[in-house]
Amino acid sequence: MQISSLSPPEIVAVLPAAGNGSRMQNDRPKQYLTIGNDATGHKTILEHTIDALLRHSRVQRVVVVISPDDTFFHTLAIANDPRICAVTGGKLRADSVLAGLAVVADSAWALVHDAARPCLHQDDLTRLLAIVEQSDVGGILAAPVRDTMKRSTDGFIDRTVERNDLWHALTPQLFPAALLKQCLQRALQDGVAVTDEASALEYCGYRPQIISGRSDNIKVTRPEDLALAEFYLTRLQ
């Protein structure tokens, strides 16, 4: 559906960063681990992620959703940037995103991005943001599945899954703030597991658009991801 507007809507990024990243086996949440080199800058993963968002002229603000017991965010230089604010999140990702949306105008579009996904390419972001001019539902970055996919229930292969129509959901995911808020609230109220923002819209009957994104837009989840993220960051410079 084509939508028209006298002026482009505000784009506000929401970063759920309240998780503890236990799989990293570190003394701090993964988003506060430092990566980079002289070319990219020695910064936390969160800082690299925020830099990638604010580098784009269409992204006006970033809302970082942190844990109630977070002791790291306010020690970072970015905490003093007037374009960035921090709010307290909840136990579930959906709770944290809703906390971020509470400070986003309903007329804005919410660009939800994983705090530990620092290798976002500007071309991908530009193509995703173009959805604002074409849709009233929104969409996500995703990468086509290239590996052979197996289904297993007990450690043994049950069958091979057809991969032609399978996509790896990435972030950012972009939706009208009011619509995303409504869908997240309904999904939570109904006890539906929300693994990403698009799944909340799907539950409410919407079909977000898929924008093919780069596979190097990785999420840092395990210790071995750190070196790969540093490599990809260097290539983005």
UniProtKB/Swiss-Prot annotation:
Its EC number is 2.7.7.60. Pathway: Isoprenoid biosynthesis; isopentenyl diphosphate biosynthesis via DXP pathway; isopentenyl diphosphate from 1-deoxy-D-xylulose 5-phosphate: step 2/6. One of its GO terms (molecular function) is 2-C-methyl-D-erythritol 4-phosphate cytidylyltransferase activity. GO terms for biological process: isopentenyl diphosphate biosynthetic process, methylerythritol 4-phosphate pathway. It comes from the Bacteria. The record marks 23, 30 as: Transition state stabilizer. Pfam families: IspD. It catalyses: 2-C-methyl-D-erythritol 4-phosphate + CTP + H(+) = 4-CDP-2-C-methyl-D-erythritol + diphosphate. Keywords: Isoprene biosynthesis, Nucleotidyltransferase, Transferase. InterPro entries: IspD, IspD/TarI, IspD/TarI_cytidylyltransf_bact, Nucleotide-diphossugar_trans. The keyword Transferase applies. The record marks 163, 219 as: Positions MEP for the nucleophilic attack. CDD domains: CDP-ME_synthetase. Homodimer. Belongs to the IspD/TarI cytidylyltransferase family. IspD subfamily. Catalyzes the formation of 4-diphosphocytidyl-2-C-methyl-D-erythritol from CTP and 2-C-methyl-D-erythritol 4-phosphate (MEP). NCBIfam families: ispD. This is 2-C-methyl-D-erythritol 4-phosphate cytidylyltransferase. It comes from Pectobacterium atrosepticum (strain SCRI 1043 / ATCC BAA-672) (Erwinia carotovora subsp. atroseptica). The gene is ispD.
